Design a protein with these regions (language model features):
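Alpha-helical DNA-contacting segments of helix-turn-helix folds
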Residues: 41-50, 92, 108, 112
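Helix-turn-helix
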Residues: 3, 7-41, 45
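Amphipathic alpha-helical segments used for helix-helix packing
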Residues: 81-103, 117-121, 150-154
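Amphipathic alpha-helical packing segments from all-alpha helical-bundle domains
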Residues: 52-55, 101-125, 135-140, 147, ...
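C-terminal effector-binding regulatory domain of bacterial HTH transcription factors
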Residues: 179-196
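Generic hydrophobic, amphipathic alpha-helix propensity
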Residues: 1-4, 21, 46-50, 54-58, ...
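Short coil/turn segments at alpha/beta junctions that flank glycine-rich nucleotide-binding fingerprints
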Residues: 10-14, 85, 127
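Hydrophobic alpha-helical connector segments
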Residues: 45, 59-84, 137-141
Length: 196
């Protein structure tokens, strides 16, 4: 699987062949087919393993501490994964076959947003906010962290992942810290509601 991960990360799903993976792993194609069925099976197994690793890293860091500490720990864990597992992050973020795409980064983001949303719900209720809007903020923050991970992997390596994570966490936390109960800007004109 390590060889498959490296090849998929470097070349993408479409350009990778089982023959190439088998050759680099020093085994025959039938061995790869016996274990994974087909290229999609190997890819799915790699995506599942990477997803489990990333979710476990983040989940283990958000179980304790203040809301701000948990948020910063989650960002640090995500950025740590991006830095320590560049091939895994590449596999999760590259184009993949439609059948497997739901297993990749989209599923990871959904899972992380759900976990962050659970934390937000309880904190919103405690602070007197509607917990119904927690998924909006959870998805926004998880999306922000994911996009910064893409940026760092592609061109942001002049910054340490710890520094990047702290900046992202500060931005997210300050936004949450000053969250108004009514997010409507007073001077923004709204379109009248249409009837019928």
């Amino acid at each position: 699987m390590e060889v498959g991960r490296s090849v998929f990360a470097a070349k993408g799903y479409e350009a990778t062949s089982i023959e190439e993976v088998a050759q680099q792993a020093g085994v025959s194609k039938p061995i790869v087919y016996e274990h994974f069925g087909a290229k999609e099976g190997l890819y799915a197994a790699i995506v599942d393993r990477e997803m489990e690793d990333l979710v476990a890293r983040v989940s283990s860091r958000i179980s304790q501490g203040s809301p701000r500490e948990r948020f910063e720990e989650a960002v640090l864990a995500f950025m740590g994964y991006v830095k320590e597992e560049p091939a895994g992050f590449a596999v999760l973020t590259r184009d993949s076959p439609t059948a497997v795409a739901r297993r990749g980064l989209t599923r990871v983001i959904d899972d992380l947003a759900q976990r962050v949303g659970d934390v937000f719900r309880s904190e919103f209720e405690r602070a007197g906010y509607s917990s119904k809007v927690a998924p909006i903020y959870a998805n926004a923050l998880v999306g922000m962290v994911t996009q910064v991970g893409h940026w760092w992997a592609a061109e942001g390596k002049a910054f340490s992942t710890e520094n990047v994570a702290r900046h992202v966490a500060a931005l997210g936390w300050m936004g949450l810290r000053h969250l108004p109960k009514d997010p409507s800007a007073p001077g923004v004109k709204r379109e009248p509601k249409r009837r019928g």
